[in-house]
Amino acid sequence: MGKWEHKNIEYVLPEEIEKRSFAIIAAELAERGVVLPAEQDMITRRVIHTSADFDYAQTMTYSENAVEIAKNLIKNGADIVTDTNMALAGINKKVLASFGGEAHCYMADAEVAAMAKERRTTRAAVSMELASKREKPVIFAVGNAPTAMIQIYEMMQESNWRPAFVIGVPVGFVNVEAAKELILQTEVPYIINRGRKGGSNVAAAICNALLYELRDHSCNK
């Protein structure tokens, strides 16, 4: 087997890679005839950027004024709770902290593991229950466990509690689509990807897209 030829390699400066990536995304969306709503544009593009999957241009679903609501929550110091440590690691916590918010994941807590074992349920479900008791408004960023979204829905059905916002992008085959549809039929503000696709990286990308838009707007004032 011969050596790889380098003639098709595009040499890009490190600081230009992201800019070049978004230019490619813009060009491919135009080729496909896809025009994203202005409010949703940068969030969906960042999801495509993190996944290299243009299907998201068709399946990302936003409740009315979702982006404005989410950004206002962040500006007012809302916290973000994730269902995986991977999503937690991917969120830009420095930018979030600049608005007074914190990011949390309870999945590795001993208390959560014990409660889940006792109840014969998932740690993700217990994590959402604990997060619902936080005093501050919480943006729930679910990128892995449909049981987290099912738990959020069930808590809404059993009480007057409502989540401030739901980012629902769990990935997989079992109960994933049904769990997303549960939240879609509620009146809570949400950003959800219909279908089986999603993931912790997608959940983090959505959070970061919101954070970066707020940061950039603040810097341009």
Give, region by region, the residue ranges found by the protein language model.
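C-terminal functional extensions of proteins
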Residues: A164, V174-K221
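Buried hydrophobic positions in well-ordered alpha/beta secondary-structure cores of metabolic enzymes
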Residues: D83, I167-G168, I206
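Generic structural signal for well-ordered, non-membrane alpha-helical segments
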Residues: P14-F22, L36-Q40, T44, S63, ...
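Alpha-helical scaffold segments in soluble metabolic enzymes
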Residues: R20-E28, R46, I69-L73, G90, ...
